[in-house]
Amino acid sequence: MPWLQVRLAISPEQAETYEDALLEVGAVSVTFMDAEDQPIFEPELNTTPLWAHTHLLALFEADTNAEMALAHLSLLTGEELPEHSAEVIEDQDWERSWMDNFQPMCFGKRLWIVPSWHAAPQPDAVNLLLDPGLAFGTGTHPTTALCLEWLDGQDLDGCNVLDFGCGSGILAIAALLLGAEQAVGTDIDVQALEASRDNAGRNDIAAERFPLYLPEDLPHQQADVLVANILAGPLVSLAPQLATLIRTGGRLALSGILAEQGEEVAAAYADSFELDPIANRDGWVRITGRRR
């Protein structure tokens, strides 16, 4: 059965208005999708997670007049519609188009992120199987990519790793597959911990190698490597705490930082770490260094 699919690029502030309006003009389903693989931070319980750049997908019966539906939508919202498109798709094509958004990706020399439904392009490589779920990080966002490439370039054999703000668990699981002995994950969101646990199981990671905690339950033990792909503000305020969680000589990688925020974040860590040059990609940066 074919469907009319309408896609709109919205902000989080527009989400409720457009969801209600689309349902009123006849949409049979409304779905929110992350436009940039931007991690979610501190979503409210029992609410729909939203991203800074969100795509809203609405499905209508195939015989719906797209122009009339969009005109009605504009009247209901009382504003000019944001960037949008409309097309008729088949059921099978709709599912395939969603899956086709997630192709295997290589990071560094060894590491591949592979959707669980896709064959690994290089079976002998380090392949991390991932199902994009609540969009806690799939590798497509520059901050995630910067961290994955850094991990791929490290000697992690026998290391203990702390993933602070673990989201999907992608960084911790990558570290384990790259040779780390254990990775600890912590996140403020129980949904993120569930996603991490599911993805660890998908990669045959035993639970004892990847314990997961809410921040208030995190044991105080020093890691050989700490990665934190969160936001600049929390990274600055957490700098003293994170410094205590890394042993002397241990390694640090921070991201989730806009280029214009890089110097401020680096300054917060400069007293405790010997910092490397800041790595930049598409307006985002990664800060790395060693604990003094």
UniProtKB/Swiss-Prot annotation:
Name the reaction it catalyses: L-lysyl-[protein] + 3 S-adenosyl-L-methionine = N(6),N(6),N(6)-trimethyl-L-lysyl-[protein] + 3 S-adenosyl-L-homocysteine + 3 H(+)
GO biological process annotation, one example: methylation
Q: Which GO terms describe its cellular component?
A: cytosol
Q: Give the UniProt subcellular location, in the record's own words.
A: Cytoplasm
Question: What disulfide bonds does the UniProt entry report for this chain?
Answer: none
Q: What's a Gene Ontology MF term here?
A: protein-lysine N-methyltransferase activity
Record's keyword terms, sorted: Cytoplasm, Methyltransferase, S-adenosyl-L-methionine, Transferase
* Residues in coiled coil: none
Q: Where does S-adenosyl-L-methionine bind?
A: T144, G165, D187, N229
Supply the InterPro entries for this chain. Ribosomal_L11_MeTrfase_PrmA, Ribosomal_PrmA_MeTrfase, SAM-dependent_MTases_sf
Protein name, UniProt field: Ribosomal protein L11 methyltransferase
Q: Which family does it belong to?
A: Belongs to the methyltransferase superfamily. PrmA family.
What is the stated purpose of this protein? Methylates ribosomal protein L11.
